[in-house]
Amino acid sequence: MTGKAKPKKHTAKEIQAKIDAALTNRGGGKAGIADRTGKEKGGHAKYECPHCKITAPGLKTMQIHHESKHPNIIYEESKLVNLHAVLAPVAESKPKPGIRGSLKK
């Protein structure tokens, strides 16, 4: 049991983790579509495996994945799906009228 009069304090590591979690964009939802598809930064999820649909940033990484996960299937670069060419650019939508944002500024 902790003493009733003693205040509970947070460690510096815990506070830093909270600050990091609050300020870092984790890329979920519509805000992270451009980051996940790799259109803007050019490195995220460029190639897709035709067998298991897992993504990889480059051909060498995809070859390593193929050799470890699909050893009985012949590796062919021509069958890989280039997601940068397939995915259309993200369309910018205008804000809808009558929808108020957060009150927290």
UniProtKB/Swiss-Prot annotation:
Record localization: Nucleus; Cytoplasm; Cytoplasm, Stress granule
Tissue: Mainly expressed in the epidermis.
Signal peptide: none
Alphabetical list of InterPro entries matching this protein: MBS1/2-like (IPR045230)
Any one GO biological process: response to photooxidative stress
Induction: By high light. Triggered by the carotenoid metabolite beta-cyclocitral (beta-cc).
Alphabetized UniProt keyword annotations: Cytoplasm, Nucleus, Stress response
One cellular-component annotation, GO: cytoplasm
GO molecular function: DNA-binding transcription factor activity; transcription cis-regulatory region binding
Membrane spanning residue stretches: none
Presence of keyword Nucleus: yes
Reported phenotype of the disruption mutant: Normal plants under standard growth conditions, but severe symptoms of photooxidative damage under excess light due to a deficient induction of singlet oxygen 1O(2) detoxification reactions, thus leading to pale leaf phenotype, early senescence and lack of anthocyanin accumulation. Increased susceptibility to low temperatures and high photon flux density (PFD) conditions. Increased lipid peroxidation in response to beta-cyclocitral (beta-cc) associated with reduced induction of reactive oxygen species (ROS) responsive genes (e.g. AAA, LTI30, ZAT12 and WRKY40). Altered induction of gene (e.g.
Basic and acidic residues: bias regions: 36-46
Annotated stretches, region: Disordered: 26-46
Function as written in the Swiss-Prot or TrEMBL entry: Required for acclimation to reactive oxygen species (ROS) responses downstream of beta-cyclocitral (beta-cc) or mediated by dihydroactinidiolide, including singlet oxygen 1O(2) detoxification reactions, especially upon light-mediated photooxidative stress, and leading to programmed cell death. Prevents leaf senescence. Involved in cold acclimation.
PANTHER family named among the record's database cross-references: GEO09665P1-RELATED, PROTEIN METHYLENE BLUE SENSITIVITY 1
Protein name in the entry: Protein METHYLENE BLUE SENSITIVITY 1
